[in-house]
């Protein structure tokens, strides 16, 4: 084959660094965005924080587009409508406009406005988590009870070892034999000694601490009570706990030879006990969610409003901008010029990130407005494509916006993805949100007769009477998702 040269014209999609950064920032959570900004501030001398609080320039126009207007100077009065979306969403241009290669290096034109003023708070006030951390842990509380006891150093050391061996529920999961093998051999502890100190530990508060299983935990608590049915309750937790767990009241009455009234009284006594005595002293990991968007009522409807506290306040460093302006075209400034470009990209991409979050949030609010007034039962079916088509964005963009972004509403704080979901058919040919169906199932079970609880089949029939076509297995799936026990486990005397 003879070698030859050919000219071919073709097109291919190339992601510019600016677009790549925009996509990456869009899918970051609030915490991840803060970390990204901190890293950029460390690495880029052209970038700095804006310390002044400025009113938001972000506005949603009547056609659904978002405009960034020049921000007025801060006024003493509280600004109105900061970072709010008030209109129906409409298609927007998802492009970047200019390429960011202009010569304007002034800091004001490239400042990422704060969109709203931050409320002043009392820094001296302790948070609920700080107050929680001030309370003693289970081990600290047990040590407080052990310290004043006049027992030998050997016994006290063994008691401390047992306290350290408890799990967070207050149980001793290791057997006495295992405890003995873990103790120093030279001390030659016998099982009887370990059992004696464990008995001492089980006399401490909270009642039930140091138990080796659920039956022993409940029995330890019952022995401290005075109740007409205490002995019957002790018999149940010691010998028939498995029957009580499955609510087999018929076999229980037969095994105990008691009437229904006595069994019911003993059951209520057992239910008043704490199966996990250590929980009251546990310190769960902080699981706080900072909302990206607030929803409030106003203007005859519901309005989405950006949370100003999660918005980075960035601008171009004035000093370096002046240096670059004066040294324009000179050699040796290429590095700073690149840093300037990166700073401008970051500021603009963060602006566009919050632009999309606001517009998507408002579109969700307008479609789920009944939810904000009536709760889950009023949730309507919604898919990502519906929002994407309305706003003129790609479905993948909506997915990125709704992942790890949270909305604070009168009904609670939810991830934006919460407002989307599958649907079930109705008899009229329409569709109902699976979230609304789950709420209905929860409502039906909450109103059931505990002596004759509703089966999954009966719940499906009741939903059918309301016009929802739901199979029994679907009811079971939704019930399990709600962590509601099966019908036999919900039955009571």
From Swiss-Prot:
Keywords: DNA-binding, DNA-directed RNA polymerase, Nucleotidyltransferase, Sigma factor, Transcription, Transcription regulation, Transferase. Gene3D superfamilies: Homeodomain-like, RNA polymerase sigma-54 factor, core-binding domain. Residues 68-131 are annotated as: Disordered. GO terms for biological process: DNA-templated transcription initiation. Sigma factors are initiation factors that promote the attachment of RNA polymerase to specific initiation sites and are then released. Belongs to the sigma-54 factor family. This is RNA polymerase sigma-54 factor.
């Amino acid at each position: 084959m003879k070698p030859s040269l050919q000219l071919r014209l073709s097109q291919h999609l190339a992601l510019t660094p600016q677009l790549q950064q925009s996509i990456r920032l869009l899918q970051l959570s609030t915490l991840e965005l803060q970390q990204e900004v901190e890293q950029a501030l460390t690495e880029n001398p052209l970038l700095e924080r804006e310390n002044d609080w400025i009113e938001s320039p972000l506005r949603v126009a009547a056609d659904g587009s978002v405009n960034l207007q020049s921000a007025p100077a801060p006024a003493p009065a509280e600004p109105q409508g900061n970072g709010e979306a008030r209109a129906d969403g409409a298609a927007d241009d998802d492009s970047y406009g200019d390429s960011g290669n202009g010569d304007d290096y002034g800091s004001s034109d490239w400042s990422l406005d704060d969109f709203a003023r931050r409320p002043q708070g009392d820094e001296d006030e302790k948070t609920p988590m700080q107050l929680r951390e001030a309370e003693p842990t289970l081990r600290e509380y047990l040590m407080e009870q052990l310290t004043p006891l006049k027992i030998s150093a050997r016994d006290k050391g063994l008691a401390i070892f047992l306290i350290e061996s408890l799990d967070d529920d207050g149980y001793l999961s290791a057997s006495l034999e295992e405890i003995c093998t873990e103790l120093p051999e030279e001390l030659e502890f016998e099982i009887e000694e370990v059992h004696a100190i464990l008995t001492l530990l089980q006399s401490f508060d909270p009642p039930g601490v140091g138990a080796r299983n659920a039956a022993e935990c409940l029995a330890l608590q019952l022995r401290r009570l005075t109740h007409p049915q205490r002995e019957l309750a002790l018999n149940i937790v010691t010998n028939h706990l498995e029957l009580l767990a499955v609510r087999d009241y018929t076999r229980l009455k037969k095994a105990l030879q008691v009437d229904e009234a006595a069994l019911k009284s003993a059951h209520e006594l057992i239910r008043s006990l704490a199966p996990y005595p250590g929980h009251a002293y546990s310190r769960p990991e902080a699981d706080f969610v900072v909302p990206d968007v607030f929803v409030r009522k106003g203007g005859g409807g519901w309005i989405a409003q950006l949370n100003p506290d999660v918005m980075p306040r960035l601008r171009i460093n004035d000093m370096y901008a002046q240096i670059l302006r004066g040294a324009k075209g000179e050699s040796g400034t290429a590095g700073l010029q690149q840093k300037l470009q990166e700073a401008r990209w970051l500021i603009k991409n963060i602006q566009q990130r919050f632009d999309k979050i606001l517009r998507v949030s408002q579109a969700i609010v307008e479609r789920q407005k009944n939810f904000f007034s009536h709760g889950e039962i009023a949730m309507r079916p919604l898919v990502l494509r519906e929002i994407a088509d309305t706003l003129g964005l790609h479905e993948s963009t909506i997915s990125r916006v709704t992942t790890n972004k949270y909305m604070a509403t009168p009904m609670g704080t939810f991830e934006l993805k919460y407002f989307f979901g599958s649907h079930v058919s109705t008899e009229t040919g329409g569709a109902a949100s699976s979230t609304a169906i789950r709420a209905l199932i929860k409502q039906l079970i909450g109103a059931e007769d505990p002596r004759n609880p509703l089966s999954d089949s009966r719940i499906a029939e009741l939903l059918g009477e309301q016009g929802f076509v739901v199979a029994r297995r679907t009811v079971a799936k939704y019930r399990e998702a709600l962590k509601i026990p099966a019908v036999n486990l919900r039955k009571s005397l």
